[in-house]
Amino acid sequence: MKKKLLAGAITLLSVATLAACSKGSEGADLISMKGDIITEHQFYEQVKNNPSAQQVLLNMTIQKVFEKQYGSELDDKEVDDTIAEEKKQYGENYQRVLSQAGMTLETRKAQIRTSKLVELAVKKVAEAELTDEAYKKAFDEYTPDVTAQIIRLNNEDKAKEVLEKAKAEGADFAQLAKDNSTDEKTKENGGEITFDSASTEVPEQVKKAAFALDVDGVSDVITATGTQAYSSQYYIVKLTKKTEKSSNIDDYKEKLKTVILTQKQNDSTFVQSIIGKELQAANIKVKDQAFQNIFTQYIGGGDSSSSSSTSNE
């Protein structure tokens, strides 16, 4: 999924809402037994220092702040479309995946909506910063479309063996891709794929190697990070077509805009700064000492601390 599911989110959201009845009252009884009870307040006092519970309270705050500021600009269809994509990806296992993450369909929708609201806020700020300097920097770093044939393998020794065949005179690279590549999306087409420097379908190491090749050139074995943790995949690339880069920046203006905005969305420091500004503007007051530090990753010290101060009012 594009956004990670929060494990235990349903339970923790329920826990976080107990804060409302934690002050001045034991709240309702949650558990009764022979000779004793467990109240909402007792439960709240036990869990409020749990890092997971604190993270959920932070998420709830962000959700409310961004919903108030940007909620009217987000169409529910965007959320529904994302849910539809996830259902297509996971098929009949979708409900099980949600359940394992401690979520229902409704809580997942709420999570997606919050993510999209943050994305909307980031996009607005990023668009306001689309300066000539930003465009020039993106243009200097941009490489237009190339077409290549790619063979992906999971074993380095196998990759070296295939490379030897690929560099042999008269080698049929397309057939080698069909016979050996583990990339199901491209192998049947002889490994052919078109991409530019902004594409995400191809690892950065592979793009860099491909851009350095002449047409009909074949790379050495390229090692890239695999999809599994601490794993590697091995690529062999043959460049078949190279687009000459225009010297006129206006020819790429729309593409460069997309590149810049995507970079901003992927810049965790930039995203955190936007969230921090919105939280400060909302004049957040923390009512329980246990939660006084949950906003520090977004709101630093100095003047900003007054916007997330602890209050006993």
Curated annotation (Swiss-Prot):
Lipidation (N-palmitoyl cysteine): C21
Main localization, broad class: membrane
GO biological process terms, semicolon-separated: protein folding
GO cellular component: plasma membrane
A Pfam family the protein falls into: Rotamase
Signal sequence coordinates: 1-20
Family annotation (InterPro entries): Foldase_PrsA, PPIase_dom_sf, PPIase_PpiC, PrsA_foldase, Trigger_fact/SurA_dom_sf
GO MF, one annotated term: peptidyl-prolyl cis-trans isomerase activity
Catalytic activity: [protein]-peptidylproline (omega=180) = [protein]-peptidylproline (omega=0)
Cell compartment(s), UniProt: Cell membrane
Lipid sites, type S-diacylglycerol cysteine: C21
Membrane-related topology note: Lipid-anchor
EC number: 5.2.1.8
PROSITE patterns with a match to the protein in the record: PPIC_PPIASE_2, PROKAR_LIPOPROTEIN
Domain annotation PpiC: ranges: 143-241
Keywords noted in UniProt: Cell membrane, Isomerase, Lipoprotein, Membrane, Palmitate, Rotamase, Signal
Family: Belongs to the PrsA family.
Cited NCBIfam families: PRK01326.1 (NF002361)
Role according to the record: Plays a major role in protein secretion by helping the post-translocational extracellular folding of several secreted proteins.
Protein name (database record): Foldase protein PrsA
Organism: Streptococcus pneumoniae (strain P1031)
